[in-house]
């Protein structure tokens, strides 16, 4: 059995717990679909290597599903990040709804480019060299877009990490600050997943330009996606973050429920500002750094006053 086919079996066995270990949440769907895409893609490539079926059809399908798995996994990371931001809203650098909406939009565009480019690339021998070039450029554009998205994503996640560290200094000391949930494990998992996908995008950018033998790239692809799938099965966000999206951590580190918490993250900016600055980059610099806000406004506190009271 080839290395790729061995990883197919592993992918299938690790993807199933994603959909049954906890109540399904939004991020569970793309995690499972991404694993299924990987399995389908490598199965098609296995049949191609075995000389079974139509060569062109198998190559086209395998390329589309293998390359399409990455953006699908990325979508899961964006949903997990949004859920994390809504759980600790006081440390969120921007609205979780805004983060998910913006990244998912560009992720869908990358997925479309991958599938279109793979189709053109696979059937290029029946047409002109121009078709091959267009398909190759579409795949490159998709991989570059995904690498840029995850670089930005890591920067936003790092900003959240820094804010959480500052906030937890004010919480009562427990195993994880004021809440018993190991939500920082979700942050670390997102860091790892981002690194996997950035590496994957980088070698696909190089691979479609310079490779002469695709086996090392397929093994690397399967290994990274297998690690990503296994990691989220071991550290499943659905087991760490509360299922009820109305539950959040207040500025005192205690969990509470808020019936209107989803409304606290609606984008109330003018339409033109939403279009020109969908990620609310301006908000990163104009936000009042002196105050942390509880969504219910019941526990709003001035950090400087708190520090002064603690010192006196």
From Swiss-Prot:
<dbReference type="Pfam" id="PF04479">
    <property type="entry name" value="RTA1"/>
</dbReference>
<feature type="transmembrane region" description="Helical">
    <location>
        <begin position="29"/>
        <end position="49"/>
    </location>
</feature>
<feature type="transmembrane region" description="Helical">
    <location>
        <begin position="142"/>
        <end position="162"/>
    </location>
</feature>
<keyword id="KW-1133">Transmembrane helix</keyword>
<comment type="similarity">
    <text>Belongs to the lipid-translocating exporter (LTE) (TC 9.A.26.1) family.</text>
</comment>
<dbReference type="InterPro" id="IPR007568">
    <property type="entry name" value="RTA1"/>
</dbReference>
<feature type="compositionally biased region" description="Polar residues">
    <location>
        <begin position="11"/>
        <end position="21"/>
    </location>
</feature>
<keyword id="KW-0472">Membrane</keyword>
<keyword id="KW-0325">Glycoprotein</keyword>
<feature type="transmembrane region" description="Helical">
    <location>
        <begin position="61"/>
        <end position="81"/>
    </location>
</feature>
<feature type="glycosylation site" description="N-linked (GlcNAc...) asparagine">
    <location>
        <position position="258"/>
    </location>
</feature>
<comment type="function">
    <text>Lipid-translocating exporter-like protein; part of the gene cluster that mediates the biosynthesis of hydroxamate-containing siderophores that play a critical role in virulence via intracellular iron acquisition during macrophage infection.</text>
</comment>
<dbReference type="GO" id="GO:0016020">
    <property type="term" value="C:membrane"/>
</dbReference>
<feature type="transmembrane region" description="Helical">
    <location>
        <begin position="103"/>
        <end position="123"/>
    </location>
</feature>
<feature type="transmembrane region" description="Helical">
    <location>
        <begin position="223"/>
        <end position="243"/>
    </location>
</feature>
<comment type="pathway">
    <text>Siderophore biosynthesis.</text>
</comment>
<keyword id="KW-0812">Transmembrane</keyword>
<feature type="region of interest" description="Disordered">
    <location>
        <begin position="1"/>
        <end position="21"/>
    </location>
</feature>
<feature type="glycosylation site" description="N-linked (GlcNAc...) asparagine">
    <location>
        <position position="304"/>
    </location>
</feature>
<protein>
    <recommendedName>
        <fullName>Lipid-translocating exporter-like protein RTA1</fullName>
    </recommendedName>
</protein>
<feature type="transmembrane region" description="Helical">
    <location>
        <begin position="183"/>
        <end position="203"/>
    </location>
</feature>
